[in-house]
Amino acid sequence: MAPPTTIRTRDQALAPLATLDSQTNCRLKELVQWECQFKGAEYVCSPFKRLFEHCIAPDKSATNYEVTDTYTNS
């Protein structure tokens, strides 16, 4: 099971992280999930991409922020 992930809006993700200092390391991570539907005698699957900002705080704790927006999968 995946760990809990904080969900933020696009605007929140683009704003400076007030709780973390300017020395914080952040990387963009991508997760692809598949949405499948059964049609007739076969499954039709489409990818759904989710983006996360993975940040390491000064105390070495890691936090993931979802930054997926409406344009990510268009």
From Swiss-Prot:
Protein keywords: Membrane, Mitochondrion, Mitochondrion inner membrane, Transit peptide
Gene Ontology CC: mitochondrial inner membrane; mitochondrial inner membrane peptidase complex
Localization per Swiss-Prot or TrEMBL: Mitochondrion inner membrane
A biological process from GO: signal peptide processing
Subunit structure: Component of the mitochondrial inner membrane peptidase (IMP) complex which at least consists of IMP1, IMP2 and SOM1.
Function: Non-catalytic component of the mitochondrial inner membrane peptidase (IMP) complex. IMP catalyzes the removal of signal peptides required for the targeting of proteins from the mitochondrial matrix, across the inner membrane, into the inter-membrane space. SOM1 facilitates cleavage of a subset of IMP substrates.
Other comments on record: Present with 358 molecules/cell in log phase SD medium.
Name of the protein in its database record: Protein SOM1, mitochondrial
Provenance organism: Saccharomyces cerevisiae (strain ATCC 204508 / S288c)
The gene coding this protein: SOM1
